[in-house]
């Protein structure tokens, strides 16, 4: 494939050599957070994204299905210089199939805020060959302040039927800690453990319900936490690593504060 000509080997976050063409002019992003980061910084490079890439609003590029089922044939037809993936968001088999088709793939690994800042720097400077985005150091400064004390026991569900929650070694868990939350299920062996309804609320002082991947709403979710403050938050603020980090700390802090000061719902009651 032509994208391999005139390339030089770079090493992605997983240690894989990636023959990156210079200059990079055509990028397909299979990660919503990274799509927003690239579109906000160098929109001219982005030639396709997934159906889940909702930001920035009005993003007008071809879509190549989802993060877990990308249209590999369509991606190959677009002849990208680079495809951007993430270890957690995308499947290894899809990365391998793209590479087998001689398409360069850069995989990021992000499980903490610090890893996010480092991975974003490497993506832009090493993989894309651009300058470090100006919003990155600004976002680092936003999150440099220590977390409020004491930490409050929290649960962050990501699914129900069955209930699944944020556990250990996750970007969302690290971000939550910096907001003053202690995830009560962080000691479990799985990163996103399944829990029973009883386990769901044990030791929980506040429940944080995002609108992705499961769409929790005031009518779907809060009733499972009777007597416990519930914060309904944007999944983008809680789980995305990109320009949203500039405002996410203030937004989430305000939402957590409001939840703690609102009367907790009684059994069967919908929180206001």
Model-found features: residue ranges?
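N-terminal ligand-binding lobe of clamshell/alpha-beta domains
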Residues: 1-272
């Amino acid at each position: 494939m032509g994208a391999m000509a005139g390339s030089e080997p770079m090493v992605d976050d997983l240690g894989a050599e990636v023959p990156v063409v210079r200059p990079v002019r055509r990028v397909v992003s299979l990660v919503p957070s990274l799509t927003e980061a690239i579109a906000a910084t160098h929109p001219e490079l982005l030639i396709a994204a997934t159906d889940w890439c909702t930001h920035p609003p009005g993003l007008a590029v071809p879509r190549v299905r989802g993060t877990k089922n990308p249209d590999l044939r369509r991606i190959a037809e677009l002849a990208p210089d680079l495809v951007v993936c993430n270890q957690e968001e995308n499947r290894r088999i899809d990365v391998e199939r793209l590479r087998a088709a001689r398409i360069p793939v850069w995989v990021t690994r992000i499980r903490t805020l610090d890893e996010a800042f480092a991975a974003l720097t490497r993506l832009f400077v090493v993989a894309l060959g651009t300058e470090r985005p100006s919003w990155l150091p600004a976002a680092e400064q936003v999150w440099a302040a220590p977390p409020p004390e004491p930490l409050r026991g929290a649960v962050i569900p990501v699914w129900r039927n069955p209930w699944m929650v944020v556990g250990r070694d996750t970007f969302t868990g690290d971000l939550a800690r910096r907001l003053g939350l202690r995830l009560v299920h962080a000691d479990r062996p799985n990163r996103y453990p399944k829990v029973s309804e009883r386990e769901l609320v044990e030791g929980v002082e506040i429940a944080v319900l995002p609108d992705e991947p499961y769409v929790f709403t005031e009518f779907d979710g809060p009733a499972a936490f009777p007597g416990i403050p519930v914060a309904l938050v944007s999944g983008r603020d809680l789980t995305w690593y990109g320009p949203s980090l500039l405002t996410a700390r203030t937004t989430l802090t305000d939402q957590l504060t409001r939840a703690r000061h609102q009367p907790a719902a009684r059994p069967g009651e919908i929180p206001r």
